[in-house]
């Protein structure tokens, strides 16, 4: 199981040597207990690289100490500090990335001090660096690194590269979490997450973050090959820009992919939707949150089309879990014939302490992109006590309803990509986090 939450950075204290005694050698970067154990997780990278330097003489105790520190970080990917990166691999193999111009011979792992500990240490500058492991003609992802980036290079059969994102890159990165499986629904789905810039920096080892969950997780990142050629929402790219410009607070985004049962799970069939809602609340979310540094507050939930519908259903049914929902081009028509559509349910849900974002493209006159349906739900919410304002002049809060109409905008990922900044700035303004 990949664990991304174990990043505590506690400065160790080193007392001065007593008068008349011989001074002890420099203990290196700060440690948890004053010299024997590095700070946990990737926050301890400077200390682990110091342990590597100390083991260069192949002293068995120093090598064992290094192994212990690396074992404690198994599955977290390469460690970086001070312009150097340490990679651990299962067997000797080449490591090619953008920092060495994808040279297959520039860096390779090997047995350290004649042991079965296989590592490589090389110079890597600040930045977000894609890389692959290379064995002869075979290029592969690093199975010990959950971080990845999409790659639309035709020669990359994976469609992805592994990633080393240095804490000072100014960029966030994507990570793969454990798949989420449901015995009731009879399926599994991939779960990925966006971790904000400097998430793994030593100084942020104890920092926690607000969390946004998103539906249709395979469509929300910068995968240029997805979504009928429309590219994804590129929420990760948008967040990097919005955070850098101090418009959006650093947040974690967790996105679960939809399955072949998407339509029914997201609201077409009410019994299946209710099963999915229980799965999302009771299984998927707690499992994913265990692997990131959540601030413990209520969650936000977002989606588009049917994903926007089920986001609203989740938030309205579980205000004890969610503080906000965003529905982009929400498909609010399912179950109209049964009089159990969202518009039929909203009066019964009543006013909840939720910030809500609703938008659409198209034209209300012909209900293209669900425009008329969205306006009807918007007006119902206002009647119940939500206070409407129009993007981008929306202030967050438990009574806030932020609305946007993009006239003529189509029902696809390109349109949602163009509007994603609106709900992010509304729900996670930098000045309030």
Regions found by a protein language model. Give the residues of each.
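Ser/Thr-rich, Pro/Gly/Ala-heavy low-complexity intrinsically disordered linkers and tails
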Residues: 1, 5-40
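Aromatic-rich carbohydrate-binding modules that target alpha-glucans
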Residues: 75-126, 134-167, 181-182
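N-terminal cap/lid segment of alpha/beta-hydrolase-fold proteins
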Residues: 157-203
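Gly/Ser-rich "nucleophile elbow"/oxyanion-hole loop immediately N-terminal to the catalytic nucleophile
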Residues: 200-202, 265-305
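Short beta-strand element of the alpha/beta-hydrolase
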Residues: 203-217
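Cap/lid segment of the alpha/beta-hydrolase catalytic domain
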Residues: 220-231, 244-278
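Primarily recognizes the serine-hydrolase "nucleophile elbow" in alpha/beta-hydrolase
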Residues: 296-351
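C-terminal catalytic histidine-bearing segment of alpha/beta-hydrolase fold enzymes
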Residues: 359, 363-365, 369-378, 384-433
